[in-house]
């Protein structure tokens, strides 16, 4: 509706029965009419992938490698493509951030992630997501700054694969600001020229920052809010 889709993220511990997990996904699809489900944790991937009631629902997961996909009759060496399955490719984020910051021995990973496009399911490439740094913070911070979360900066990932371009956090130094803008352009170039489906976090298109907070789920304030007036600057 209105040219947007709504997906819900569901986390499974692996202790639920496969039937319960399947029923939960079906419930969200048929009762709330979500367009897709991002499966986190330990979901029964093969059961959900082969569920005929979910055949028209986008299912995103960290990996579909363990899912058996039938061969095509026309091309026996290829697996039948399941258009509703998408891999949430965190490997792209890690490898391309390391490329962006100039880590050694990354050419092979650059080629792999740029060309990767499995025949059986789609790949969703991204440089930032809801659980981590925004793209602006990716080029502004080398350390997380989650003090405002009230957990003594212990929450959130310590592995962010980022480079601050010479200064940690906000700065007015012209050369640093220019370098960060250049790095953002490089990041978008890597994203859009790679095979698969590009995805970017809302606000990254205008340089939104969470002040280095990479776990802002609990911040219902300026840290997590988007200032759409930045589109005009």
Give residue ranges: language-model regions.
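Extended hydrophobic/aromatic segments used for targeting, binding, or gating
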Residues: 210-233
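Short acidic/histidine-rich active-site segments
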Residues: 201-206, 210
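The substrate-binding groove and active-site-proximal loops of carbohydrate-active enzymes
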Residues: 7-19, 33-43, 96-99, 166-179, ...
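Substrate-binding/active-site clefts of carbohydrate-active enzymes
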Residues: 1-33, 42-53, 57-58
